[in-house]
Swiss-Prot record:
Its EC number is 7.1.2.2. This is ATP synthase subunit alpha 1. The record marks 373 as: Required for activity. F-type ATPases have 2 components, CF(1) - the catalytic core - and CF(0) - the membrane proton channel. CF(1) has five subunits: alpha(3), beta(3), gamma(1), delta(1), epsilon(1). CF(0) has three main subunits: a(1), b(2) and c(9-12). The alpha and beta chains form an alternating ring which encloses part of the gamma chain. CF(1) is attached to CF(0) by a central stalk formed by the gamma and epsilon chains, while a peripheral stalk is formed by the delta and b chains. InterPro entries: ATP_synth_asu-like_sf, ATP_synth_asu_C, ATP_synth_asu_C_sf, ATP_synth_F1_a_nt-bd_dom, ATP_synth_F1_asu, ATPase_a/bsu_AS, ATPase_F1/V1/A1_a/bsu_N, ATPase_F1/V1/A1_a/bsu_N_sf. It catalyses: ATP + H2O + 4 H(+)(in) = ADP + phosphate + 5 H(+)(out). Produces ATP from ADP in the presence of a proton gradient across the membrane. The alpha chain is a regulatory subunit. Belongs to the ATPase alpha/beta chains family. PANTHER family: ATP SYNTHASE SUBUNIT ALPHA, MITOCHONDRIAL (PTHR48082:SF2). It comes from Vibrio campbellii (strain ATCC BAA-1116). One of its GO terms (cellular component) is plasma membrane. ATP binds at residues 169-176.
Length: 513
């Protein structure tokens, strides 16, 4: 068979055109050192701060230090089989986590992967963990309440939707218990909850999940876990991942509550990473940007206006405001709120609930110290009936503390002082509350009404909690419609006051406690 030169050249041309070759530019580097979860990479020229770097075996590292001739990255997960000389690739992507209603009722790790054994999560959307907080114009003032179910908190230190309220205290003072009760109280309120566990024992987290399930609150809660056994990188990133999941609801006109338990451990994890990256240490060996670590996280908790929600959803959701309320927890050492991280977070948040060891050990639980606990914006969001009735509670407790200290030095007290001491003692007793027993608006209002109108004067101190239980049981039995109406509206007027007075008078007449 004879082929002429034209046919040969056509054949070669055809073969060349049909040859399947794809050229792609890859941003590659080489690991030059591995130590304590930190890798140094040479040759990654085109990499951005916070970029995901793909490692052999399908794992990832996070680029944190961009230096002249190397990149310092922190490995997210185990790093035992990483070796010098291994090739790594820049992905050009920032860390993203799955978000959406599909995560409700699930326990996930920092990367949004399920760890509860209930199968995969079919989330349709992902969101970057680092997002710039809404600007001033996009925000709306806080004027709707988040009921925690605690008499002492809802009456004296009210929390509003979109607020950041710090829960601070020593270890074993009931900080987690307060946050979990606040989540349990949201199960019928339409507020979604996210609980972020940072650096805690796995057994403690399992107990929290079990309690949420027992009380029917897990179905509208996402639990994000970075336990004590996880790497420092995952503990540092967990709050941002949880916040991204909460922002999904905020930006679509829903309300969400997020608990960070606790940010002290996140700061310690970040300190560990920073020191290993050879960043210069500052006060208490924390890096210079530890304030920014918490401020950029907590500023993302906000109440956003209707225009923001409408713009974000491309007009699908109209006339609805969204909110993300944050309850960060900080653990103090021996009650020292003037340490570096506590003062930082106090200055960032809109108030703090200080839990005191002495009160906790004295049986006052929740151990809220009304002296230094404050809510800077929650007053305007407080339920009307609680706001009208609870004005004297904080004053009574503050005066009682002062007089109790004074009374230790004096035996002969005048009648007015004795009366004040007795009232303060009874209000302190009345503020006690069992765990996993959040109270409705009506129950709180009725108890505070009884305290403020002098109905406790003839009740012995050791019978006070029996009096409270019997009063609430009587009210729910005899005045069920009235109770349901107050729970729904939270309204207060002369008619409501007269009804509360009649109810309490009727109960006192029965003498059944």
């Amino acid at each position: 068979m004879q082929l002429n030169s034209t046919e040969i050249s056509d054949l070669i041309k055809q073969r060349i055109e049909s040859f399947d070759v794809v050229s792609e530019a890859r941003n590659e580097g080489t690991i030059v050192s591995v130590s304590d979860g930190i890798i140094r990479i040479h040759g990654l020229a085109d990499v951005m701060q916070g970029e995901m770097i793909e490692l052999p075996g399908g794992r990832y590292a996070l680029a944190l230090n961009l230096e002249r001739d190397s990149v310092g990255a922190v490995v997210m997960g185990p790093y035992a089989n990483l070796k010098e000389g291994m090739k790594v690739t820049g992905t050009g992507r920032i860390l993203e986590v799955p978000v959406g209603p599909e995560l409700l009722g699930r326990v996930v790790n920092t990367l949004g992967e399920p760890i509860d054994g209930k199968g995969p999560i079919e989330a349709k959307l992902t969101s970057p963990v680092e997002v710039i907080a809404p600007g001033v114009i996009a925000r709306k003032s806080v004027d709707q309440p988040v009921q925690t179910g605690y008499k002492s908190v809802d009456s004296m230190i009210p929390i509003g939707r979109g607020q950041r309220e710090l829960v601070i205290g020593d270890r074993q003072t009931g900080k987690t218990a307060m946050a979990i009760d606040a989540i349990i109280n949201q199960k019928d309120s339409g507020i979604f909850s996210i609980y972020v566990a940072i650096g805690q024992k796995a057994s403690t987290i399992a107990n929290v999940v079990r309690k949420l399930e027992e009380h029917g609150a897990l179905a509208n809660t996402i639990v994000v876990v970075a336990s004590a056994s996880e790497s420092a990188a995952l503990q540092y990133l967990a709050p941002y991942a949880g916040c991204a999941m909460g922002e999904y609801f905020r930006d679509r006109g829903e309300d969400a509550l997020i608990v960070y338990d606790d940010l002290s451990k996140q700061a310690v994890a970040y300190r560990q990473i920073s020191l290993l990256l050879k960043r210069p240490p500052g006060r208490e060996a924390f890096p210079g940007d530890v304030f920014y670590l918490h401020s950029r996280l907590l500023e993302r908790a906000a109440r956003v206006n209707e225009e923001y929600v409408e713009r974000f959803t491309n007009g699908e959701v109209k006339g609805k405001t969204g909110s993300l309320t944050a309850l960060p927890i900080i653990e103090t050492q021996a009650g020292d709120v003037s340490a570096f991280v506590p003062t930082n977070v106090i200055s960032i948040t809109d108030g703090q609930i200080f839990l005191q060891t002495e009160l906790f050990n004295a049986g006052v639980r929740p151990a809220v110290d009304p002296g230094i606990s404050v809510s800077r914006v929650g007053g305007s969001a407080q339920t009307k009936i609680i706001k009208k009735l609870s004005g004297g509670i904080r004053t009574a407790l503050a005066q009682y503390r002062e007089l109790a200290a004074f009374a230790q030095f004096s035996s002969d007290l005048d009648e007015a002082t004795k009366k004040q001491l007795d009232h303060g003692q009874k209000v302190t007793e009345l503020m006690k509350q069992k765990q996993y027993a959040p109270m409705s608006v009506f129950d709180q209002a009725l108890v505070i009404f009884a305290a403020e109108r002098g109905y406790l004067a003839d009740v012995e101190l050791n019978k006070l909690l029996d009096f409270e239980a019997a009063l609430l049981s009587y009210a729910r039995g005899q005045y069920a419609e009235f109770a349901a109406e107050i729970d729904k509206t939270g309204a207060y007027n002369d008619e409501v006051e007269a009804q509360l007075k009649k109810l309490t008078d009727d109960f006192v007449a029965t003498q059944t406690w």
